[in-house]
Amino acid sequence: MNLSKYQNESVIRRLLNESKTIAVYGASNKIWRTSHSISKFLLEVGYEMIPVNPNYDEVLGVKCFPTLSDIETQIDIVDVFRHPSEVITIAEEAVQIGAKAIWFQEGVINEAAAEIASSGGLDVIMDRCILKEYNFHIN
């Protein structure tokens, strides 16, 4: 699989600069989880971070939603921290809610999910860390 079409530097830079609201799918209260530290980082640098995880009522003091469909706010980026085998339904849901982009974190590689999102009009980033990319492009 050629990941380069899902790692376009100008798209990454535009998403990081123009986005305001990021739904973190797989957000966690477990401080050792990457999704926890990145959720915290997103809040600290000024994004509206919306956690998505059916196992929590809140993450980092922010109301947590069981699914993307439960969120009433317009989502700019859906940042995905789930096993690649679980992301097709997340991509479908991201399209259904009208998200602008889906960002599959490092190691989350599923071309079928990326194609679903892309065909649905979303920008797609895959196998890149949003925190590292922010530090590279913005900081």
Where are these regions (language model features)?
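Structural/interface elements that position substrates and couple domains in central-metabolism enzymes
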Residues: 1-75, 82, 87-139
